[in-house]
């Protein structure tokens, strides 16, 4: 589906991809991005030439059409509020096997104007536990191409920036939760820097 979405993206949204040289071709990887619209996982996946699994809000996967499409395309259900051990175990296994997992640390779409909401620490926590790097990604313009309240996307310009790999590090004697929060703020700063 990536070639089809690339064509659609260039035709309808003048899709621009920057920093694709930063995308690792193999090895366990978390792809962490801001979240502006339901187009995001598909647009971000266009230049990535490896299987990706998506952690998606479990409620969305119950929607009649969208849920089925997302499952076929590799989405796994995640309870956004609280802990979800099954989704985390599944992600760890996939990462140990050298797979890539896409996570939106905002836990849902950001603000309607495209600005971000505070990141949850799950992406960094999984990266630390699985000992894998994070590919920070910034998506711009998707909030205007498919704003909240509109049933289908419209035309617009979408730009995706793939930043250099981020390696979260726990400081000596640092509490795991404090580390995940601190490193999540650093990750958010990297992604926000290109908005």
What are these regions (language model features)?
Residues 1-9:
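N-terminal nucleotide/polyanion-binding subdomain common to many enzyme families
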Residues 4-5, 72-78, 108-109:
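Short, basic, glycine/proline-bearing loop/turn elements
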Residues 8-10, 70, 94, 126-127:
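A generic structural signal for well-ordered alpha-helical segments
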Residues 10-18, 82, 142-144:
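Short gly/ser/thr-rich secondary-structure transition/capping motifs
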Residues 10-11, 23-82, 90:
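Catalytic core of membrane glycerolipid acyltransferases/transacylases, capturing the structured
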Residues 14-17, 75, 160:
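Generic structural signal for residues in well-ordered beta-strands
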Residues 86-195:
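Non-catalytic C-terminal accessory region of glycerolipid acyltransferases
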């Amino acid at each position: 589906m990536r070639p089809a979405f690339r064509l659609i993206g260039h035709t309808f949204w003048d899709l621009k991809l920057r920093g694709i040289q930063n995308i690792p071709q193999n090895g366990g990887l978390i792809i962490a991005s801001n979240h502006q619209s339901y187009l995001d996982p598909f647009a971000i996946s266009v230049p990535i030439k490896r299987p990706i699994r998506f952690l998606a809000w479990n409620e969305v996967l119950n929607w009649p059409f969208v849920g089925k499409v997302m499952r076929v395309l590799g989405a796994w259900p995640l309870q956004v509020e609280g802990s979800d051990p099954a989704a985390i175990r599944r992600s760890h296994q996939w990462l140990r096997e050298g797979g890539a997992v896409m996570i939106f640390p905002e836990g849902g779409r950001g603000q309607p104007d495209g600005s971000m909401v505070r990141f949850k620490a799950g992406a960094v926590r999984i990266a630390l536990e699985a000992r894998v790097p994070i590919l920070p990604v910034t998506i711009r313009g998707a909030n205007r191409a498919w704003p909240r309240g509109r049933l289908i996307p419209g035309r617009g310009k979408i730009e995706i920036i793939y930043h250099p790999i981020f390696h979260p590090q726990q400081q000596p004697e640092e509490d795991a939760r404090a580390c995940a929060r601190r490193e999540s703020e650093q990750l958010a700063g990297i992604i926000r820097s290109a908005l």
